[in-house]
Amino acid sequence: MKIFSGSSNKPLAQNSAKELGIEVSPLEISVFPDGERRIRVVDNIVDEKTVVFQSTSTPPDQNYMELFFIADALKRSGASTVTAVIPYLGYERQDHVFRDGEAVSLEVIVKTLERVGVDKLVAFDLHSIKVPELFTIPVLHLSALDLFAQKIKELGLTENSVLVSPDMGGIRRIKMLSESLGNMPYATVEKNRDLETGDISDSSMKGDVNGKTAIIVDDMISTGRTIVAAERILLKNGAKNILVFATHAVFSANAPELLENLKAEKVFVTDTILVPKEKRFSKLEVISVSKTIAEGLKNF
């Protein structure tokens, strides 16, 4: 197996390769003055199984184009298979038409990945369990929930705590985590979002958090407004303490500032997306998924 990395998250590729006891193979990635990219495979990879890491977070278009070029270069260089490890799958929320006249952006991404030679895909905590159905190639859908359960146990939060989904779409995720924590109680926040602006107009809650530690769990944090709205409802309903867990640290706009100013004690994310120094804040703690990816690749 040969492992390669795009530009978006080299530390995750290196750590995952280390877990497998191998080195990341070199790639020449150069950028022309006009911004176009050129990819060149350096090593002989004829008949080799290859893996390429690339999170397609900000800037998603640039990261996807680089991934397409890498996959094409690997196949042209004789790789027997190309497995794309895309820990955060950009455009995954655009998986259907919300309003007339829209493109289904994720379908375009899927078709392109398959067309350029990707044979298998590894992703983490997809926004919808239906996303893998869009692919004709095998998809390994990994999750950070076991890592979250482990951290919750380490913090001694298995008693007098409630898992909270910040929206109705995360109920399945919360139920799975609840089961791994001995059927920990859970609550859900219902929110109404404007499809044009993305603004959350109002929220309500189902479940009891009064006097308890509320543990918000989501697949991603983008603008941070969903977490802010959820915290407001939880405090209103008597939550004693609040912690936040999310797989993907998208952190768009002023999300880091909003999260730092939460009443929540800690915000836990994973390294599916590389969080730059300017987006880090004192309440943030990053949990690595490198071992989970390495174990997944062994049998995929």
PLM regions: where:
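PRPP-associated nucleotide enzymes
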Residues: 1-300
